[in-house]
Structures are given as C-alpha cells and as structure tokens.
Amino acid sequence: MLFWIIKITSYFYSSTLFEVMNSVLFRGVGGLFFSLFISIVIGNRIIVWLKYKLRMLQTIRIDGPQSHKLKYGTPTMGGIIILISVVTSVIIWSDLSNIYIWYILFIFVMYGILGLVDDFLKIKRGDNLGLTILNKYLWQSIIAWILIVIMFINRVNYVENQSGLEFLRNIVCKLKIWDMILAYFVIVGTSNSVNLSDGLDGLVIVPVILVVSGLAIVTWVVGNIYITSDLYIEHVDCIKELVVVCASIIGAGLGFLWFNSYPSQIFMGDVGSLSLGGVIGLVSILLHQEYLLLIMGGIFVIESLSVIFQVSYFKIFKKRIFKMAPIHHHFELKGYMEPKIVVRFWIVSSILVLLSIVIFILSKY
C-alpha cells in the first residue's frame, strides 16, 4: 500500500528521497520495525484477552516433564500476535502487485487458521491432541496443493492460438510434476517440523528468526541481477520483494520473543508454528533453495527426525531411543535446565544458518 502511495507521489514530485523510500531495503527495514512495534503494542492486550476472557490456557501433558506443570495457566494461541503483525506490515510495506506476496499471505493465513482450529480443539477437549493427525495432515495437504497448482499454472506461458489439446499438453509438460511433489513435501514438512520444535519457552521463535534472516539474505542475493551475475548464481525475477516479508516476520518474531522468553507469558501454539513453518518452506521453494533449507533449518530437521526415529524404533523393538521425543524433552528429562537447552539450540541454529549461507555462496564456484 505504502509502495503505491510513494510511487504515485513520485510522479508529481520527482525526488531521490522517494526513490530511496521505494527501495526494497528501505521498505524491509520499515516493515521490520513496524511489525516489531505492532507485536509489542498488541501483545499484552492479546495475552489478557486470551488468558482472562477466552480462557485459552495451554493444556499440559501428563507424561511430560514435571517442570511443565509450572506452566499451567499460561495462555496459548500467541501466534495470533505474529499473524496480525506480519499481515498488517506486509500489506502496508510491500508491493501488492507482486504475485509472490499473495502466495506467502495465502499459506500464512490458511495455515494460521488451521493452527487456530487445532489449538481451540485442544483447549475445548482439555487434552493435548486437537485435530487428529490424519485430519491435520489432510487439511495441510489440501491447502498446500491448492497453492502449488496455482503457482505452477502461473509459470505456464499461455499462447492464444494454441488449440485446447495443445494448450493442455503444454501445461502438463511445464508443470513438472516432480517439482510439484517436492514443493508439497517442503511446505508440509517444514510446517510440521517447526510445529514439533515448539515445546519450550523461546525455543522455536529464535531459530525461526535466524532461518528467516538467512532466507532474507539469500533473497536479496538471488533477486539482484548484478550480484547474481558476479557470483554466478541463478537470478529469480521479482523475488527481491520477499525481503519485505522476511523482515516483517523477523520484527514480529522479536516482538513475540519479548513475551515468549523464559518464563513465558504466552505460548505460540499451532496458529504460529504451522503458519511460520509453511512460509519458511514456501520461501525456500520460491528461491529454488529447498535443499539449502535442510542445513539452514537443521534444528527443525533434528527435532522431526527424533520423533520419527523414536516412533519407528518403538514399533519395531518396543524400546525407546530417547527418554522422550521431540529431542528437547529428552534433554529436559536428563536434568538440563530449560533456559540452557533453549540457548544451546539457538547457538546451533545460528551456526547452521551461517554455514548454509557460506555453502550457498561457495557452491557456485
């Protein structure tokens, strides 16, 4: 919105200032501070609203670590803070004529709604189950496939004089079914991985901020034709606008961390983790950096693998590899204090993000 106001104004009042204000870098910084401001301003109000008016309090697992009983009475659904802050910031600071922005908003909002339903059912039923695994996976898949089909059809160049059969054949050839399947697994897989990682105060939001920061750097590089030509990196047209989205998520994440740091005043809930994970996966697809995400989001991968190995091993051998999965609970049961586990996960995530950026640059030589 602000992009077009500045653009229209610059037609009547030509100025270098307007050019700077309309740059992606300026709007990215603006989006970051704006979403940070919004999240801090609305944070306390939403916490009070969820805790005292709606009574949306986190249910505690009976078989979980004993220390988690102290968390009873803490409100959940804190991802609403992030959702409102990011969507508002993106609408104000980004170029809404860019199709990538709408892809991001679609997956962010739809996965947010799905997470909201899941959180609500957990609280209503008084357990920690919510939607069944099958139902959650089904709706994640439906949302992902709707977006993927739209994305890949938009990549097809329509030729008016083609016959219906020729046009259909052209679409089928250019859709690249394997790319679509990969995109599906990246979106749904990342969404669930971030969701599994959300189990301790501040544990997931900082790795999300770090990974999104890494993706913002990659976005800036692949979106700049001069940098890509110098580094022999694949250039992606119009992708640089996603810097504004990434910056808005970073700002909202920092604002949420203000309330989610130990001891947490509010939990993110599925409304936040599913939507953030979906966006991270989608951005990596749009950047053509799906494999780089495996390193950059290594913390999420480790958390997911710990659950997969635990469940598989138990079904086969009737024994457990870890005391509890995901793996952050294993460390809790081994006697590590929650803040120490969280900070160490942050350190590992920082290293992985830096390593992935180095690999991204050096792999082109």
From Swiss-Prot:
PROSITE patterns linked: MRAY_1, MRAY_2
Main location: membrane
GO biological process, one term: cell division
Recorded metabolic or biological pathway in which this protein acts: Cell wall biogenesis; peptidoglycan biosynthesis
Gene Ontology CC annotations of this record: plasma membrane
Keyword Amino-acid biosynthesis: no
InterPro entries tied to this protein: Glycosyl_transferase_4, PNAcMuramoyl-5peptid_Trfase, PNAcMuramoyl-5peptid_Trfase_CS
Alphabetized Pfam families for the sequence: Glycos_transf_4 (PF00953), MraY_sig1 (PF10555)
Localization (cell): Cell inner membrane
Catalytic activity: UDP-N-acetyl-alpha-D-muramoyl-L-alanyl-gamma-D-glutamyl-meso-2,6-diaminopimeloyl-D-alanyl-D-alanine + di-trans,octa-cis-undecaprenyl phosphate = di-trans,octa-cis-undecaprenyl diphospho-N-acetyl-alpha-D-muramoyl-L-alanyl-D-glutamyl-meso-2,6-diaminopimeloyl-D-alanyl-D-alanine + UMP
Keywords: Cell cycle, Cell division, Cell inner membrane, Cell membrane, Cell shape, Cell wall biogenesis/degradation, Magnesium, Membrane, Metal-binding, Peptidoglycan synthesis, Transferase, Transmembrane, Transmembrane helix
CDD domains recorded: GT_MraY
Entry-linked NCBIfam families: mraY
Family from the record: Belongs to the glycosyltransferase 4 family. MraY subfamily.
Protein name: Phospho-N-acetylmuramoyl-pentapeptide-transferase
Gene label: mraY
